[in-house]
Amino acid sequence: MSDPITLNVGGKLYTTSLATLTSFPDSMLGAMFSGKMPTKRDSQGNCFIDRDGKVFRYILNFLRTSHLDLPEDFQEMGLLRREADFYQVQPLIEALQEKEVELSKAEKNAMLNITLKQRVQTVHFTVREAPQIYSLSSSSMEVFNANIFSTSCLFLKLLGSKLLYCSNGNLSSITSHLQDPNHLTLDWVANVEGLPEEEYTKQNLKRLWVVPANKQINSFQVFVEEVLKIALSDGFCIDSSHPHALDFMNNKIIRLIRYR
């Protein structure tokens, strides 16, 4: 049995065997480790490959088993496909193509469920009336919460690209607030009368905007209208059997379905 070989792939170390690396002779790795192509070394003497180290584990596992094993919530399919193209592992490229067809079929039929909650609370803040002179004030504030679930990860990504948080005076994508690929929770406030801009930052109050309309969402009615525009354009339709009509009209529950 040959000695173990340690690879440095983009800064991540992997240890394997020569037999594994040459299991597909026509691949770039097969050429590199059969002496047909030169290899580079890092300062520790490990074989260095200047590619993405994170997804290389899936490529290495495929070399070992000839099976494509990915977690259910895998989100780097595009990156893995590019890396497979680089290493020229043809059976892996074909397995990825089959996997993408499978995922595409699963994404066509989808369900979208949104539960909405709203409350009013009092916010206290200081107002600068003159240099060194401040007064304490308060105002009612509408606080909104939307709990969004969809069986389509791609739709949630699309929705996340259209909605932006306004915080610290800047607009930022809400995609970082995805709890997992199928869940998204949003919390935001409407404009508060008399509240200075710096107080939104100080009290960590986020406002919500939608693009490309560049419209601030100050009510559930506007939120529902904008989400429906995005969902309907992506092939969803309202599920007339659920929820109860009163819940839908009162903006408490929204359920949409998509059949393709």
Swiss-Prot record:
The keyword Transit peptide does not apply. Residues 88-112 form a coiled coil. Highly expressed in cerebellum and brain. Expressed in adult cerebellum (at protein level). Pathway: Protein modification; protein ubiquitination. Keywords: Coiled coil, Growth regulation, Tumor suppressor, Ubl conjugation pathway. Residues 3-72 form the BTB domain. One of its GO terms (biological process) is protein ubiquitination. Homopentamer. Interacts with KCTD11; KCTD21 and KCTD11 may associate in pentameric assemblies. Interacts (via BTB domain) with CUL3; indicative for a participation in a BCR (BTB-CUL3-RBX1) E3 ubiquitin-protein ligase complex. Probable substrate-specific adapter of a BCR (BTB-CUL3-RBX1) E3 ubiquitin-protein ligase complex mediating the ubiquitination and subsequent proteasomal degradation of target proteins. Promotes the ubiquitination of HDAC1. Can function as antagonist of the Hedgehog pathway by affecting the nuclear transfer of transcription factor GLI1; the function probably occurs via HDAC1 down-regulation, keeping GLI1 acetylated and inactive. Inhibits cell growth and tumorigenicity of medulloblastoma (MDB). This is BTB/POZ domain-containing protein KCTD21. It comes from Mus musculus.
